[in-house]
Amino acid sequence: MGILSLTLKFKKNFIPFLFCIMNVNLTAHAETQKTNAKWDPTVLGFESPQGGLLGDMYGLRPALENAGFHYSLAYVNEIAYNAAGGYNHDKEASYIDQVSLTFTQDLERYTGIPDAAIEGNIVNRNHDSNLRRDRLQDSRALRTDESQESWGGQSITRLGWLTFSRSFDDRKLHWRIGMMNKLQDFDQAIGCDFQTLNLCGGKSANSGWWYNWNSYYWGTVLKYDLTSELTAKIGVMEQNPEMGSRRRAWSLSSDGSKGFLLPMELEWRPMLFGKLPGIYNIGTQFTNSPQADLSEGKSGYPGAIDADGYREYHRSWYFSTAFNQQITQKDDDPQRGMSLFSSLAFSDQRSNYIRYSASSGIRYRGLFDLRPEDWIGAGVSYIKISNHYKGNLNYLNELNNVSDYSNPLYNPIPDHSVTAEVFYRFKITPWFELQPDLQYWYHPGGIKETQAAWVIGLKTSLNF
């Protein structure tokens, strides 16, 4: 079955619910068996570093590690080329890159405090080159995906997080405090190896209340290990839309905070089918920060003409779930085989233009004996747009008396979009990887008038 056939099937609105059903069925019918196998997330997409380009740096790295300082210095670039279709057919190769330093300083060895550590992340991003914005999508529409997930909108060096953590209760209760990013504790089921954004990680960032990467929020998190496999998590963070701005790259201030964000999650990390690891989570977010209605006004009129502006809500929720399960093992090697992943999220469509989003796909590590560390990945994402948002655009078109899509005053009406991606990642050396990919965009930005697009991508990764 071709990608076009798959796309036509996705035009039905019931498709996202199949992701949910698949998630429930896999969890309900799989039985956890007692096994001596080690829980190894490699085939799930979480591959441990195997050494860097700079080696031990004349003994510096081992000396730092002996002092409890562990770090990862990595470089990534992403290229995307519009091979066919899209809103603008002029050819362009968009390029972005980033360098990241992620580190942990073990404090337990010096203080005796269980699991005490300082963790930090610094990211340098370069270039505002965005194929989705410049070629694939109508500029009048809001984004539903990215062809280069690492695009950050600017060249900047900024703090991603800086936190202190420790444990209590015989290392069952874990506490973190400081300038934190959600990736440290929440929504960790799915890794970020695809180049399209919606296949990179889970769906919790689609709430629009926090960022996936390299932006921090003041807050604190508690995690409790209910069993060796099951963990409950809860946090309190500032809800601050200013944190992604340039002026807040290194700021300690909480100016701009609109309220608090309360994330909660239950995570399960079992060994299923006797020996195969998996990660399952279900979570919610609550915020009391003001959220503007996308359609209705404060006085009961349409917000576009209401003298008091759009209605605001001070209690908003967001729900997400995900799983990532290894389903095969090749030649009794726990680090070779296939994994299956899926994620699903629902928002408050009164104030979030994305009503729900879903993704599903597979990864295979070591399919070929001659290339045991290479990866193959394939996935599909679906975005459904809020009825409130669409209603407001329809009203604006009526107000302006325009119905012609080609009229600059016309607001295109989005409904849903589908993005598919296939990649192959070559492990050239333990520290150098090349990952060509092919992307298919159906209804970019959710706009049916925009021609489907084919994109050729290339991701390059270096570990130092």
Show where each model-derived region lies:
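Signature for the C-terminal beta-barrel architecture of outer-membrane proteins
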Residues: 204-330, 335-340, 344-347, 364
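Residue-level signature of outer-membrane beta-barrel architecture
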Residues: 62-64, 77, 105-109, 165-168, ...
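Outer membrane beta-barrel
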Residues: 96-241, 352-356, 367-394
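Outer membrane beta-barrel transmembrane domains
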Residues: 265-267, 283-317, 328-333, 348-356, ...
